[in-house]
């Protein structure tokens, strides 16, 4: 008999534009590949002044994908209004220190309790720590949380005034779980300390390897969303590294694609050698244009998406040291890692004059992605068997 799994998320799976969309969808598909029957409960919490049309489109795309396995719970405007008041109070009087379960939907426990009575799920898998409150009232054979990120003291981790919780709050939330999914190695170790009686798995996110031909130009590629960490990393590269590259290689180009183009338009696109491509429907539209990709991001937590993505698209990949934290087999990953601009230039000088080395790195890219994907499958098999 197939294992029955209920995934609960306040994040939709479609359209797949952000890292968390991709991670949740990949998790669901992995469980289905391992013969689980997976239902998806989408808890929709719209802003009071949000884009109704955009939410309707994403809702419909998610519902169409899941079909008969789609479940839905909508947070009311009254509840959202109250949550906004709480958030303002936390901001003014608590330095944005949140309550552990401030985001928890009021109707979720009763709704899932009825679902469990009717359907009898073996596993419940919630997305993010703030939904683990459910497990205080509704029981399953396995009660799991896909953390996506380490949340404690996030304001200090990213050096920004953002909502945060402390380690005790995060520990108490995760201790409601029998099983915890981390998205990188360092966070796996951290969660095991917070919740020593829980089983902790490191699942990264699987990537498909896509072979790309050797191009032979002097083009650097950067595909990114528009969050502040990505903007800061790109600014560091453009101000500290790219001028040195252009001094050495007057024909060097930086191609930038993705949502980040919307927020940097007019800031960098007038700099010689930089071109903004905007939104690309298929990442291959960017990655087929050069041999080298960069990830200069030096802030943030969680999965290093751009690092893995660049390897999976068969690129020679240059990264800031922050962007290898916790990745699969960090010491042997096919990456150039440095925070020193002159070392980036020296490496490019060597790579751009040596096709054989580029082709060797491409071989290593394929082996790395295949090895990581095998590891991920084994982690899920271990989760289902434990």
Language model: regions and residue ranges:
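Membrane-proximal helix-turn-helix segments that form the acceptor-binding/catalytic region
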Residues: 26, 107-114, 145, 151, ...
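Active-site proximal beta-strand in glycosyltransferases
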Residues: 138-156
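Donor nucleotide-sugar binding/catalytic pocket of nucleotide-sugar-dependent glycosyltransferases
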Residues: 144, 171, 175-211
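Conserved catalytic-core segment of nucleotide-activated headgroup transferases in glycan assembly
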Residues: 202-270, 276, 280-281, 288
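Acidic donor-binding loop of glycosyltransferase active sites
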Residues: 288-302, 313-315
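Short hydrophobic beta-strand element within catalytic cores of glycosyltransferases
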Residues: 306-309, 316-320
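Conserved acidic donor-binding segment of nucleotide-sugar-dependent glycosyltransferases
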Residues: 334-342, 350-355
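A charged, aromatic-enriched C-terminal amphipathic alpha-helix characteristic of glycosyltransferases
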Residues: 353-385
């Amino acid at each position: 008999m197939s294992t029955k799994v209920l995934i609960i998320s306040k994040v939709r799976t479609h359209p797949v534009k952000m890292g968390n969309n991709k991670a949740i969808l990949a998790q669901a598909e992995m469980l289905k590949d391992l013969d689980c029957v997976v239902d998806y409960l989408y808890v929709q919490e719209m802003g009071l002044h949000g884009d109704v049309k955009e939410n309707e489109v994403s809702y419909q795309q998610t519902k169409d994908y899941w079909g008969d396995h789609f479940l839905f719970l909508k947070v009311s405007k009254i509840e959202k209004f109250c949550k906004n008041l709480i958030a303002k109070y936390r901001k003014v009087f608590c330095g944005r220190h949140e309550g552990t379960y401030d985001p928890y939907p009021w109707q979720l426990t009763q709704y899932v309790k009825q679902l469990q009575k009717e359907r009898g799920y073996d596993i419940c898998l919630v997305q993010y720590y703030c939904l683990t409150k459910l497990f205080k009232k509704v029981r399953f054979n396995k009660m799991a949380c896909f953390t996506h990120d380490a949340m404690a003291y996030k304001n200090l981790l990213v050096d920004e005034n953002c909502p945060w919780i402390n380690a005790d709050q995060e520990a108490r939330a995760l201790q409601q779980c029998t099983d915890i999914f981390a998205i990188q190695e360092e966070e796996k170790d951290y969660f095991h300390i917070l919740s020593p009686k829980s089983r902790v798995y490191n699942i990264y996110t699987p990537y498909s390897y896509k072979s790309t031909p050797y191009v032979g130009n002097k083009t650097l590629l950067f595909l990114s969303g528009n969050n502040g960490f990505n903007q800061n990393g790109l600014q560091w590269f453009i101000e500290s590294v790219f001028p040195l590259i252009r001094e050495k290689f007057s024909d060097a180009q930086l191609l930038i694609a993705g949502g980040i183009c919307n927020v940097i338009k007019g800031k960098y696109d007038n700099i010689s050698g930089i071109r903004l491509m905007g939104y690309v429907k298929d990442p291959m539209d960017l990655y087929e244009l050069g041999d080298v990709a960069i990830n200069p991001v030096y802030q943030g937590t969680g999965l290093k998406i751009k690092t893995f993505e660049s390897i999976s698209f068969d690129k020679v990949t240059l990264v800031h040291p922050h962007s290898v934290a916790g990745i699969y087999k960090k010491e042997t990953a096919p990456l150039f890692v440095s925070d020193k601009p002159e070392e980036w230039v020296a490496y490019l000088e060597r790579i751009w004059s040596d096709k054989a080395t580029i082709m060797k790195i491409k071989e290593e890219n394929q082996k790395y992605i295949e090895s990581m994907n095998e590891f991920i499958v084994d982690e899920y098999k271990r989760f289902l068997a434990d």
